[in-house]
Amino acid sequence: MSGAHRLIILVAGMPGSGKSVLSSIARSMGIPVYVMGDIVREEARRRGIEPTPENLNRLARLLREEHGSTVVAERTASKIASDDHSIVLVDGVRSLDEVAVFEKLGKTVIVAVHASPRTRFERIRRRGRPGDPTTWEEFRQRDLTELGFGLGNVIALADYMLVNELSLEEFEAEAKRLLSRLTGQG
């Protein structure tokens, strides 16, 4: 697929904001979804590393040290480049340098998903994923780590902002409306 004719929807948001819900809606609309964290999980599998949150964070840092700060974006972009879909969604962009990698592949649109820290903390506690913070202090530290990657800059410069303080059903409807508008399906 020629880059000039490809739309790449880049999704950014803090942990617990609702990025995976937006990705699920995209999948249900037939939009291929690339989750940047999957690149790190694949590398862990390749190296025989148990995919615990601590190991994955350590491996992500190591990959960036070994191959540069955009290595995860570059590997994701490589997969997109061999995809013939005219619209794709990338879940988990964390820095403007990563955005620049995807801009080489086509037209990019950044969608930020935002929810207040208290809302996100409660969601994270309820979802109970392995490795999720269980205390407010752990949660705040994880936020600072994410912001240290430059995530706040991506969110601040987003083309669209979905505020997710709503019920799941209301957020899903908002997400579907936005994706329909972006993809011409609505």
Swiss-Prot record:
Pfam families: AAA_17
Protein known as: UPF0200 protein Hbut_0338
Chain positions recorded as ATP binding sites: G13, M14, P15, G16, S17, G18, K19, S20
Lineage of the organism: Archaea, Thermoproteota, Thermoprotei, Desulfurococcales, Pyrodictiaceae
UniProt organism field: Hyperthermus butylicus (strain DSM 5456 / JCM 9403 / PLM1-5)
Keyword Nucleotide-binding: yes
Similarity field: Belongs to the UPF0200 family.
GO molecular function, one term: ATP binding
Gene3D superfamilies in the cross-refs: P-loop containing nucleotide triphosphate hydrolases
Superkingdom of the organism of origin: Archaea
Keywords: ATP-binding, Nucleotide-binding
